[in-house]
Design a protein with these regions (language model features):
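Hydrophobic, well-ordered secondary-structure elements that form the walls
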Residues: 132, 170, 191, 203
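Flexible glycine/acidic-rich beta-alpha junction loops that bind and position SAM and/or redox cofactors
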Residues: 140-145, 174-182, 198-252
Length: 252
């Protein structure tokens, strides 16, 4: 593929969203799977989520750098479920040793590991943007989805990235089965404040959809969450503690 032959059909004033729409990227991941893999809404029973294993960063960087020179592409999109902070640091360190370093961005978790020192180092090493799931931006909401981080940690990580000049995007969820109107309002207010304080460049709201590979659905089939009442394709409620053909009756 010759990227220069494909024109940009539309432009976007949001710099974070322009990465998706207008950039040309080499794609790779620093780790297979997610090192957390416990979020209630996520497909945690699938191999690409639950089987976590880091790649050899040295080989990955060398391969991407050589491929980039051949194609004339200097940007890398790290398509991890959540790029490990240590692997990002290793990648940035290798990148700094090159005369013409790559630029890279990818998906992360807003962990406490991402302090200002690490964010500055990653930015110096070529990191230009991060995207990460906040999902439900209040304490009760984060606990309900087993996110494993709290609001203070999210705010600190976002601040570190933005102060280092790294573009920052958040994924949000609405309609989670345990979410009340007040939890949704609180989540929206937190997001508003994050934008107001300049800690986010963009965000996107996703409607919660229950999938057959999620932790919540697995728990439902074992007898938990009787109030969940998920629907099969024919509109009937999927039974608990009974034989059920997921392949035929449940999408997702």
């Amino acid at each position: 593929i010759e990227p220069s032959k494909y024109p940009i059909l539309a432009s976007n004033s949001n710099p974070m969203e322009r990465m998706w729409a207008e950039g040309t990227w080499l794609r790779a991941y620093l780790a297979h799977g997610c090192y957390w893999h416990r979020c209630g809404f996520c497909d945690t029973s699938l191999d690409y989520v639950c089987s976590y294993k880091r790649v050899y960063v040295e080989k990955l960087h060398k391969g991407l750098y050589e491929q980039g020179k051949k194609l004339g592409v200097a940007g890398v999109h790290l398509v991890d479920e959540a790029a490990p902070p240590v692997a990002l640091k290793d990648f940035a360190l290798l990148n700094l040793k090159e005369s013409k370093p790559l630029s890279f961005w990818g998906n992360i978790r807003f962990e406490k590991s991402f302090n200002r020192d690490l964010a500055d180092f990653l930015a110096h090493g070529g990191l230009t943007g991060v995207s990460g799931g906040i999902e439900i931006a209040c304490g009760i909401g984060l606990d309900s989805i087993c996110k494993g981080i709290d609001i203070d940690t999210i705010v600190s990580a976002c601040a570190a990235f933005k102060e280092a000049g790294i573009l920052t995007h958040a994924y949000m969820i609405y309609g989670y089965w345990l979410e009340t109107e007040q939890i949704l309002v609180d989540s929206m207010e937190t997001l508003r404040q994050l934008f107001q304080e300049g800690l986010l460049d963009s965000a996107f709201w996703h409607k919660f959809v229950l999938t057959k590979h999620s932790t919540v659905f697995k728990e439902y089939l074992s007898g938990k969450h009787p109030e969940l009442n998920p629907l099969a394709l024919d509109g009937s409620i999927i039974p608990q503690n009974k034989p059920f053909n997921l392949q035929e009756n449940f999408a997702g």
